Amino acid sequence: MTSRTAYLAAPLVMVLLLPVVGLFVSPSAADIVAGAKHPLFAPALWLSLQTSVLSLGLIVVMGAPLAWWLANSSSASARVVELVVNLPIVIPPAVIGVGLLEVFGRRGLLGPWLESVGLSVPFSSAAVVIAQVVVAAPFFVQAGANAFRKIDDDLMVVARTLGESGPGAFLRVALPIALPGLIAGASIAWARALGEFGATLLFAGNMTGETQTMPLAIYTALESDVRAAVVMSMLLAAVGVLLLVALRFAPMAWKWTRDLGGLS
């Protein structure tokens, strides 16, 4: 990188970095302790962990087969499905929240039927999970499809020739090769679910202990106690930074582990 290019890039790098630096530099130790004791902190943290882990589990279970199919199909329908999967990336989360209300709300597409069997989805913990799945799933599916596309087809053919069934070849050949990409996609999807705000607010509401996740608690705390909002923001930022660092070094660790396994 030339000095001129560095000067041009520096302002953008600073704009991206300063908000994160500000979170960790501005508050004092007393502010952090006081913020962590705020009544919104613990319930929001626990709910966020519960819902985001459940969302991630659903995304992985449903998304891995979809990613495999997208990677191995060249049909027009696969390309259409891939476009649909990526829609939540480009559609604003608030719009997704309104759309979910139009599907699951009392007057929505499924609302009357759900109400007839005694189910109400909006403004519940289930709505939090649904919102997180919708906004986060594309990141896992896309990463998984890219990982599966890198697998040499000849390896699968050899596995089948040696007597492996289709599922067996997938589990013993394809999955280990694609695992680093799947883990990276799952990490990004989990971080996205953990930080989801707009769709959750509109579809699930902002009820303490029931639908108020960490981002919503930050929004609420800003009106009464900025210290609590800063502490919760620090926690989410720290999770993001740690995930990025882990993803940066995960490929090297994976290669090192496989090399050790080959030597043993």
Predicted features and spans:
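Short hydrophobic, aromatic-rich alpha-helical segments embedded in or entering the lipid bilayer
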Residues: 207-221
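The alpha-helix within a helix-turn-helix
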Residues: 159
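Short glycine/proline-centered loop/turn elements that form peptide/ligand docking sites
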Residues: 151-155, 260
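Membrane-water interface segments at the C-terminal ends of transmembrane alpha-helices
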Residues: 1-30, 39-149, 173, 177-198, ...
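Short coil/turn motifs that cap or connect alpha-helices
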Residues: 76, 164-166
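Glycine/proline-centered hinge or cleavage motifs at structural transition points of membrane proteins
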Residues: 162-164, 176
